[in-house]
Swiss-Prot record:
One of its GO terms (biological process) is regulation of DNA-templated transcription. It comes from Neisseria meningitidis serogroup C / serotype 2a (strain ATCC 700532 / DSM 15464 / FAM18). Binds 1 zinc ion. Inhibits all the catalytic activities of DNA gyrase by preventing its interaction with DNA. Acts by binding directly to the C-terminal domain of GyrB, which probably disrupts DNA binding by the gyrase. This is DNA gyrase inhibitor YacG. GO terms for molecular function: DNA topoisomerase type II (double strand cut, ATP-hydrolyzing) inhibitor activity; zinc ion binding. Gene3D superfamilies: Erythroid Transcription Factor GATA-1, subunit A. The gene is yacG. Pfam families: YacG (PF03884). InterPro entries: DNA_gyrase_inhibitor_YacG (IPR005584), Znf_NHR/GATA (IPR013088). Its cofactor is Zn(2+).
Length: 69
């Protein structure tokens, strides 16, 4: 099947919102360019983005529990 016959998936660049065709030849996907990719990386490095997680409290371990068995 040729590319013109296939449905081409388009996504928006997370940085500049430009339409980007999702294909293996696009080395920067989902970004439109190296510049947008680096801007996003800089945002992560600056702490602008975070990944939330639920922290579970660890069970208390007493000294007898830590003894070798």
């Amino acid at each position: 099947m040729t590319e013109s016959r296939q449905t081409r998936l388009q996504v928006k660049c997370p940085t500049c919102q430009t339409a980007v065709v999702w294909k293996p030849e696009n080395a920067f996907r989902p970004f439109c360019s190296q510049r947008c990719k680096l801007i996003d990386l800089g945002g992560w490095a600056d702490g602008k983005y975070t990944v939330s997680s639920q922290t579970e409290s660890l069970p208390e371990i007493s000294e007898p529990d830590m003894a070798y068995r």
